[in-house]
Amino acid sequence: MSNLSLDFSDNTFQPLAARMRPENLAQYIGQQHLLAAGKPLPRAIEAGHLHSMILWGPPGTGKTTLAEVIARYANADVERISAVTSGVKEIREAIERARQNRNAGRRTILFVDEVHRFNKSQQDAFLPHIEDGTITFIGATTENPSFELNSALLSRARVYLLKSLSTEDIEQVLTQAMEDKTRGYGGQDIVLPDETRRAIAELVNGDARRALNTLEMMADMAEVDDSGKRVLKPELLTEIAGERSARFDNKGDRFYDLISALHKSVRGSAPDAALYWYARIITAGGDPLYVARRCLAIASEDVGNADPRAMQVAIAAWDCFTRVGPAEGERAIAQAIVYLACAPKSNAVYTAFKAALADARERPDYDVPVHLRNAPTKLMKEMGYGQEYRYAHDEANAYAAGEVYFPPEIAQTRYYFPTNRGLEGKIGEKLAWLAEQDQNSPIKRYR
């Protein structure tokens, strides 16, 4: 793979987002929790001190840009590879160029975009070269490194969390592009009204790259008015981004209204309506992974034990999206939505857990009954811990009829009332049979 270009002198054909990449920390907008004056990271960057790191954050938050800025201060070459399009061959080629740089006395930053998409063996391939100083490793990921990256790689790189840019940050990015006479639209007869700037910032959900792409598209499409200026009106934004996209506000009320409509449609067993609201969310620029997470919650809250497979379907859709990307992944989430909408419904587990939580919070902290206590030591056994515990597998039907697992003060408590729908109907029959065994058992824990 070729080196990252750090030369902005010939930018005629570069997109606005590429032209406006910050060249130093002063131009970098956002991430003040990491880059504010006096923080350790900017001090290290400005001193040219390199260390391997993982940049974790949503799209458009400046992960690639920060890597480039670091390279500028360190006077280092940058090798960039993408885990989506690169394999072992590209890794070896990048490492070889880094080795040549080291032999020539130059430093190399290896920037790996979407590093979470590399498998364990591919991630391991970087370790010896990090260890011997051939490369300074910078990985960018939108996924939680704790789950997606090897512990060996994490132990050699510091993780920095980059947050979605605020609406004010995005407005500052847009203002910077409008005022910059070298890389942006400064000095040109292009006008960005405050209301349009705010609308773009609210539309892009903290994604600076998307904001600049939107601004560039508007500048290209705007017509010259009678005064010779191109005014980027909100109506043009609506045409470009879609009316529904432009309606998302900063607080997300519109977005959460759509999510609520989707959830209620699934709960109401209305697959067609659920698909409609899902499509509305997608076309409005909503995050499909947020919908995938909501599907997982629905599978537990509204389907529950009526169809335990619902949770597996929701997890599979989420996993599919992360593996294959938006085009195919959005269809997988749609499949999960239809499955959930058509599945038998039960909130029995949800309501049971709420009731148990209420008791745990509001009632006294009753002692654990002696027969249920752990007895790992001789002293505990002498104190009676675990005595008279009935091992269910030694009982008829693997059930200790008449046994009670509650404290005596709440021995008759019941939280879970299964419905008669789906698999939960069978669960209800099983629990009714067990209750009958308890009633008929001559052995009772509490009398």
From Swiss-Prot:
Other known facts: Overexpression causes an increase in mutation frequency and inhibits growth of recA mutant.
UniProt keyword annotation of RNA-binding present: no
Annotated keywords: ATP-binding, DNA replication, Nucleotide-binding
Summary of the function given for this chain in its UniProt record: DNA-dependent ATPase that plays important roles in cellular responses to stalled DNA replication processes.
Assembly with partners or alone: Homotetramer. Interacts with the single-stranded DNA-binding protein (ssb).
CDD domains: AAA, HLD_clamp_RarA
Name assigned to this protein: Replication-associated recombination protein A
Domain of life per record: Bacteria
Any Pfam family matching the protein: MgsA_C
GO biological process: DNA recombination; DNA synthesis involved in DNA repair; DNA-templated DNA replication; protein homotetramerization
